[in-house]
Amino acid sequence: MEADDKNVTVTASVKNIGDTFAGKEVVQVYYSAPDGTIEKPYQELGGFGKSDLLSPGESQTITISFPTRSMASYDEKKAAWVLEAGTYYIRVGNSSRTTKVAAALNLKETVVTVQGKNLFPADDAPQELSKAGVTPYSYEGEAEEKAAAKQIDICSKCIKTETVVYSETPEAFPAYEGEKLTAADVKSGKATLKDLVSQLTVEEMATVCNGTADGLGQEGFIGSSSDMAPGAAGDTTSILLADRGIYNTILADGPAGLRLIPHFVVDADGKMVSSGNPLEDAFNKNEIEVPEGGTEYFQYCTAIPVAALLAQSWNMDLIRKCGDIVGKEMEEFHISVWLAPGMNIHRNPLCGRNFEYYSEDPLVAGMCAAADTRGIQSHAGIGTSIKHFAANNQEDNRMYVNEHISERAMREIYLKGFEIAVKTAQPMTIMSSYNLVNGVHTANSHDLLTAAARDEWGFAGYVMTDWGTSEDMSGLFAYKYNLKYGHSTSRECVLAGNDLQMPGQQGNRQEIIASVADGTLPLGQLQTCAYRILNVVLQSLAYDDCKPYGDQFDLEEAVTVTKA
């Protein structure tokens, strides 16, 4: 057991004590932070590692290391992440129920690790539970383990404070007065992407910031709003292809691999043959006859295990390999963005999409999403869209529900997994959720999409809405009750940094254009959204010179595992 101001490192031996079967085991490392001015849980997961397949009698040494700073808690009064003074007990086991104390880390002074600002003020402050006056959990022998634990002093002054610099409203890009710029000009270094964007009209940028569909009609139910790949969820625009060489990209849903229509028919002109009812087509493709001169196509994709099952493996190498499988098929079907992984917290077992999400633990969720993303983004020009950002923890009234969450709970539970995924994998995109948090639609939340994701975590890709977020869907989903909250708006999506609105509709474009005209939407903000979308598009597999998206970033590690 070792620890300093930078890392906590645990080395454990795993042995198969059976005499018949080979097997694997997981080593889990927890920490118990001291109660100072902030109450703490009994223990929190700090790191984990999975052994190789061990034969009877075989053993393996596993070393697990995680940043000391990751044990910090969020202090709402200080608007900062803090390591409070006291003793941090490190516990090791193969589950949260079997941990034993391995060491005691002593921090003499409270340290602010990150100084930021509160972003999620409560609109209806919940009554928080307290453990004051409650006998703390313990087990036989715990006191003796603490007394005998290895004592390690951590240097308080060696831990430096990071101060977040928050961005301001972007200024309009300086106008490029030269000839009309193209993607080739940007790629060759003749001009910058900002130069190109400065030449775009408001109408062009409003189109760039929307998908190519005309609203969320029946086809939206089956995620089939793409004009390019049957069954794919949607496309970015090709309006800039003819004169600027900027291709469109295709987005396909998940979660168990690529969700495409496995069987479809086109006529002699290359148009899909349809019964006229998209829902009927989705379930009765085999009944559609092939017309004279037509062609029958098959595009079957591999079904990988769903997220909840993958997380139960505790095997990040396995999850990365599953991402690699999806990445190879994205290349085959020319899909640029996989609308997965979903990584919301398992808050309630009644959530209808829990199978799509990894865990109730934010570290597990974040590491799984990062492993999946790294597997996919090891392929050139493709990426993931981690979702649903954030606090999408129920399906009932998911479009209009308002989640009341404290600042600390938001950061330590509901955002922590997304933060880990961004810092350790840099997903190409993030998908915002339908719901509100503390009275603000997540799709319209500048504090969530820009201040947290970009300013605090360094997210570099673009943010998209979930399908139909900025449309009025109360009639489409036949809600029978009065809605307290309306839907998010296109103008506020752009203001928040929600760059791409999907699946796109004319009303979204018109609202953006009108808002720039009346001065309620700064031109620089629209240009910035268009820039972020095109920056990703120009790195997509639509171009022969594309590279693995993640290669350009200096990625962190939430947990480092080595085996011997």
Residue ranges and their predicted role:
Residues 1-73, 82-96, 116, 120-564:
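Glycoside hydrolase catalytic-domain context in secreted enzymes
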Residues 98-116:
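Short beta-strand elements
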